[in-house]
């Protein structure tokens, strides 16, 4: 998980790595590009985990979450304030962006199985 920078909307809240899909890109291609731009890593994109939509007062965002593995590199803080590797049981220790809450709920449900 990554902590948003102080100078952006939803400052210092935690989120999953990602960003906008550019014209002509698939969602997996966008994720590969965003991981390279935000963390300087190359990932292999696996199965889609879930999709969700959330409306903030200023923007509506559509999130698609994929499982990924790092193929190359060590994550670096290029755009975020902080970075953490956590287990599902630690999710509640962090303040996430509201848009991520349905994803967190699903992760915790999956972890109970």
Show which residues each predicted segment covers.
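Generic C-terminal helix-cap and adjacent flexible tail
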Residues: 108-113
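A structural microfeature
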Residues: 1, 47-50
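Short, charged/polar surface micro-motifs in flexible loops or helix N-caps
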Residues: 6-9, 22-23, 69-73
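The catalytic Nudix box helix
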Residues: 16-48, 87
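N-terminal strand-loop-strand
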Residues: 1-15
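NUDIX/MutT-family hydrolases
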Residues: 67, 76-107
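Surface-exposed, flexible loop/turn segments at secondary-structure boundaries
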Residues: 7, 54, 91
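Active-site-adjacent beta-strand/loop module that shapes the phosphate/pyrophosphate-binding cleft
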Residues: 42, 51-74, 84, 107
